[in-house]
From Swiss-Prot:
Family label: Belongs to the archaeal SPP-like hydrolase family.
InterPro entries: HAD-like_sf, HAD_sf, PGPase
UniProt-annotated catalytic positions: D14 (nucleophile)
UniProt EC number: 3.1.3.18
Protein name: Phosphoglycolate phosphatase
Role of this protein: Catalyzes the dephosphorylation of 2-phosphoglycolate.
Record: residues binding substrate: K160
Domain of life, source organism: Archaea
One Pfam family, short name: Hydrolase_3
EC top class, as a word: hydrolase
Length: 239
């Protein structure tokens, strides 16, 4: 999989665990800047795909210097060419959210800025808590997605693959032209569909199995490693 710079038009990148220092960390790695500059230098369109709220995702894109589309809330909302696109409709009902919170979750501060998803943080680790939350959500026709950082409750019709697919259609690109990199269970569908895909070295096992390349390094350093490998050893700024 060497020397494919001409075949890759789009890089779809997760944020947390992919541009941060490692999986579970919230601090951006200095290598994330090198990733952004390398993609810009190569003329590859970036798509940030994240479970974060849209303001957070757009803020990360702006400060990294990535001018491509943004997919937020695990595919429920996107910004393409300055236009906000809603892929999901509505929000989970308060009663459902309350039932799931009673398992041992608390609200994320980002919920105030979300259009469709509701995000919950585990109060403490408890075996089977995510599986029980998913079962409750499914009973009422909703999805509960674990990102490695939070539990995301979303209406039907979401998912990162759905959001990225909507963006690709709008920019005239196909899945075969995409290099996707992600570390979480919520990235698996995109990793499986993309023509080229990778996971940082400390990614979730589901992501590693779905990816075509698994980096040696964690977090953003692993992401940079994957990009350089797929794009023929392209040189990146030091980080």
């Amino acid at each position: 999989m060497q020397g494919l710079a001409g075949s890759v038009r789009v890089a779809a990148l997760d944020i947390d665990g992919t541009l941060t220092e490692r999986r579970g960390a919230a601090r951006l790695d200095g290598c994330s800047i090198a990733v952004a500059r390398l993609l810009n230098d190569l003329g590859v369109t970036s798509i940030l795909m994240t479970g974060n709220s849209l303001p957070v995702a757009r803020g990360v894109a702006v400060y990294l210097g990535l001018e491509g589309p943004v997919v937020a809330e695990n595919g429920c909302v996107a910004v393409v060419g300055g236009e906000r696109v809603h892929i999901c409709s509505g929000r989970p009902p308060e009663g459902l959210v309350k039932r799931i919170m009673e398992l041992g979750f608390k609200p994320s501060w980002q919920n105030e800025y979300r259009y469709h998803e509701y995000s919950l943080i585990p109060v403490k680790a408890a075996p089977g808590i995510v599986e029980r939350a998913s079962a409750i959500a499914e009973e009422e026709g909703y999805r509960a997605i674990w990102s490695g950082y939070a539990l995301h409750i979303q209406p039907p019709g979401g998912g990162k693959a759905r959001g990225v697919g909507e963006v690709l259609a709008r920019i005239g690109a196909g899945w075969s032209e995409v290099l996707a990199i992600g570390d979480g269970e919520n990235d698996v569908e995109v990793l499986a569909r993309a023509g080229y895909s990778g996971a940082p070295g400390d990614a979730a096992e589901q992501a590693k199995r779905a990816a075509k390349i698994v980096a040696r390094s964690p977090g953003a350093r692993g992401t940079l490693e994957i990009i350089q490998r797929v794009l023929g050893g392209a040189r990146a700024p030091a980080c």
